């Protein structure tokens, strides 16, 4: 980290996709943009739902002076709790088209990369504060094989190659109630203010001591 560079947390969410007009990950991230948490500014970036485009946005941000942590957010429709993702695997495999209409099968995130990268976020500490606050959450062992997993894997891979040992990882969020209602789904959901609160209380745990 450059001496004197303002310390900040990179917080990302995704654009809406799959016909939706809203994505809770992007909404949560936008609401926390600019907040000071643990003496660090939150810098929010909303990512396109296409793996190459999302990587192109994130890659230069990982080089930024003063970066102390990276927290990616995404949507996991059908899950009832905040999902603290433990691992990202080296594969993209999805039949749901991305924003460019692309589908992939058995494509590595990084050719010849390791099979998986583990989150370096303090997952157990995060789970403890969420549970104490009455927010449903758990440590998840699968982030899927869509864009969320890819951006988590490629971020952890890039940081490792650069020798930047900062906390980084991925958190999945449930549907918003409006999304369940709009599609007449029998699926769990979570209010936006509660999701904002969840991320707001875990971010301080990512800030390393000076």
Residue ranges, per PLM feature:
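N-terminal catalytic or cofactor-binding beta/alpha core of small enzyme domains
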Residues: 1-145, 156-165, 185-210
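An accessory alpha-helical subdomain
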Residues: 169-178
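Short conserved micro-motifs at the rims of enzyme active sites and ligand-binding pockets
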Residues: 181-183
